[in-house]
Design a protein with these regions (language model features):
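Active-site-adjacent structural segments surrounding the nucleophilic cysteine of cysteine proteases
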Residues: 1-85, 128, 136-142, 146-149, ...
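Extracytoplasmic
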Residues: 18, 119, 151-153
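Structural recognition of the beta-strand scaffold that forms the well-ordered cores
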Residues: 22-24, 100-102, 121-126, 157, ...
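A mature extracytoplasmic/lumenal domain signature
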Residues: 27, 104-106, 126-130, 160-162, ...
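Mid-length scaffold segments of soluble, non-membrane domains
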Residues: 74-110, 114-118
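Short acidic/glycine-rich loop or secondary-structure boundary segments that cap or lie
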Residues: 110-111, 132-134
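Short, flexible beta-strand-to-coil junctions
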Residues: 124-131, 200-204
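Noncatalytic regulatory segments and standalone regulatory/sensor domains
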Residues: 136-150, 156-206
């Protein structure tokens, strides 16, 4: 690979056959294992706060805020998913020796430079197989606001850069370590609200 490019050595975990919609949890488990906090993805998923969406008689849909809980169940194929703050909380609750922080509006380039290059893998929200997202199920949040689920929502671990492409650990379908065109992944990450979670041992950065 090109000079100055690095890829972190993160052991791969697949969500296939165990957590069909648990990409966020399986990605988080890869990061926790990287920091020697050994945990099975299924054990982590058991501790994930989750809530189902429901329909009333008129067909109106009500559901939780994916910034607060996992929507549905990661153990099922019809689970939806959750956003960065839920995983940040999950890491706080299960690995108190680690510090986790949700980051918004950083570019992947910034995450790579500020964290990956310093030995810190980053959880990023993107799309399954780099597909485009599209508006999915619509429901009313507890706040009364209307929320539209972004189809193909996914979470992977950004671990490096190789030959000018991003390197990620992709829990989907046993995909393993993948390299993705930078512009493509930048776009998909952007389409999911440019959200990420960094996890570091306390006192790791001066």
């Amino acid at each position: 690979s090109k000079t100055g490019e690095i890829t972190l050595d993160v052991d791969y975990l697949s969500q296939e056959g165990i957590l069909p919609t648990g990409c966020e949890t399986v990605s988080a488990a890869m990061v926790l294992n990287y920091w020697q906090q050994e945990i099975l993805p299924t054990d982590l998923a058991e501790q994930l706060p989750s809530e189902n969406i429901r329909w009333d008689e008129s067909g109106k849909c009500y559901g939780p805020d994916p910034n607060e809980v996992f929507v549905g169940s990661p153990f099922t194929t019809w689970g939806y998913g959750c956003f960065a703050p839920v995983i940040e909380e999950l890491i706080h609750d299960t690995a108190p020796l680690l510090e986790a922080e949700t980051l918004y509006d950083r570019t992947l380039e910034q995450l790579y430079t500020d964290y990956v290059c310093r030995g810190v893998p980053v959880l990023i929200w993107c799309t399954i197989c780099q597909l485009k997202t599209s508006p999915g199920t619509v429901w009313e949040l507890p706040s009364g606001e209307t929320f539209t689920w972004p189809n193909n929502e996914h979470c992977m671990v950004l671990v490096g850069q190789q030959n000018g492409r991003w390197v990620c650990m992709d829990p989907y379908n046993g995909n393993g370590r993948i390299t993705v065109d930078k512009d493509l992944l930048d776009d998909r990450y952007d389409s999911m609200g440019s959200q990420a979670v960094v996890t570091i041992p306390g006192g790791f950065f001066p």
